[in-house]
Amino acid sequence: MLTVPASATHDDLRSIAGMRGHYRVLIVFTPSFADARLAAQRAIMAQLALKAAERDLLFVQIDPMTVIGASDRADKLRRKFVVPVLNYHAILIDKDGRTLRESHGPMEAGAILRAIDGAASRRIEVKRAHMGKPAVDKG
């Protein structure tokens, strides 16, 4: 029996590419999982847990070798988003793949919510919810 190594594809909801159209993602690149800025971001995300869930927001953490929250490889994501290994960089991505906000330090809760709530996709979701329709039009 042949085995093929797993790789992230657009159809894999666990990959950043596969999350597109389904989730918003806060991606945090950090030099180390012990970095104080990442600890601060984790605390912010813990405070936002309910509001993040309401907005379909996932949290992906990436150190030089490991990715937590997605199936992608750290080196590939660093190349894709052009983030050097020793840099701390947070990127908030909308469901359509657009970058909503970037930061070289922890992204504050209010800034995250304002960026998401100001996005056209979120306004459409809220409008559809008030009309009693699903957040996404299935066709």
What does each of the following model-derived ranges do?
Residues 1-139:
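Non-catalytic interaction/Regulatory regions outside core domains
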